[in-house]
């Protein structure tokens, strides 16, 4: 795999702190209001009152990446795992983000034709109601993060690290076999590649073999900083395997 699909909007789908994919469309759960018949025997006409709210299935189309991140979707489906799904908009539109509890109820892969990107459709069935997450959440703080390999070789990041810059690139060594990221945040819960990581502590090593990521290929790693009922901050790091 020489690259990973990437879209421009910066919208992410996360599950329990694990960034699963960048989305290519938005599908909020359809909302219906139950109609309750309250007609009595002496009513001159049928009386209907509003009842319980009901949210329908959400179907998402995402760029397909053949790695453990999206393989987790099938694992969740077969295990009937229920958790909190978060649709995370870019920071400028953070007030549109929302979360909803639910489970994976359908998965469909699409075969690409004529150089179109491979995509995957999957359906989430809500088990409760939608909660808007309109407040911006915590961010990384100085020194933000350190990205390094097993030696360790510390990778130079571009652009300069900042709590409010959300996309970075760097180049690894040719001989790098694993990647760790040490994040720093004064508040919030930090996840690196889906694994909860304490501030100032190296993440679980991310496998980075030459066979899986040959020279020139790109590994994308997400760092997510979350809080309670706030929009998570998502940082995307693209690591290109170097030639030296």
Describe the function of each predicted region.
Residues 135-244:
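Beta-rich interaction/scaffold domains
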Residues 71-73, 132-138:
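Short, charged, solvent-exposed linker or helix-capping segments at domain edges/interfaces
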Residues 13-15, 87-94, 149, 223-229:
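Short acidic, glycine-rich loop/turn motifs
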Residues 69-105:
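Short, acidic/charged, Gly/Pro-enriched secondary-structure junctions
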Residues 64-68, 129-130:
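Acidic glycine-/aspartate-rich tracts in secreted/extracellular proteins
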Residues 117-134:
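Short solvent-exposed strand/turn elements
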Residues 1-65, 99-121, 158-171:
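Solvent-exposed edge beta-strands and adjacent loop segments
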């Amino acid at each position: 795999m020489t690259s990973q699909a990437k879209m421009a909007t910066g919208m992410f789908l996360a599950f329990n702190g694990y960034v699963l994919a960048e989305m290519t469309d938005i599908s909020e759960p359809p909302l219906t209001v139950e109609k309750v018949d309250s007609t009595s025997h002496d009513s001159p006409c049928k009386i209907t009152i509003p009842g319980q709210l009901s949210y329908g299935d959400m179907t998402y189309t995402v760029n397909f990446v053949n790695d453990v991140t999206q393989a987790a979707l099938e694992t969740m489906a077969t295990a009937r795992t229920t958790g909190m799904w978060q649709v995370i908009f870019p920071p400028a539109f953070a007030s549109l983000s929302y979360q909803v509890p639910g489970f994976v109820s359908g998965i469909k892969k699409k075969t690409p034709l004529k150089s179109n990107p491979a995509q995957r459709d999957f359906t989430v069935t809500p088990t409760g109601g939608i909660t808007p997450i309109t407040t911006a959440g915590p961010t990384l703080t100085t020194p933000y993060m350190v990205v390094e390999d097993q030696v360790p070789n510390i990778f130079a990041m571009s652009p300069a690290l900042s709590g409010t810059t959300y996309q970075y690139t760097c180049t690894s060594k040719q001989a790098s076999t694993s990647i760790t990221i040490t994040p720093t945040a004064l508040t919030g819960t930090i996840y690196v590649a889906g694994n909860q990581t304490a501030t100032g502590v190296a993440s679980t090593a991310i496998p980075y073999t030459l066979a899986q990521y040959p020279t020139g290929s790109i590994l994308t790693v997400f760092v997510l900083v979350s809080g309670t009922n706030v929009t998570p901050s998502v940082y995307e790091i693209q690591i290109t395997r170097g030639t030296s």
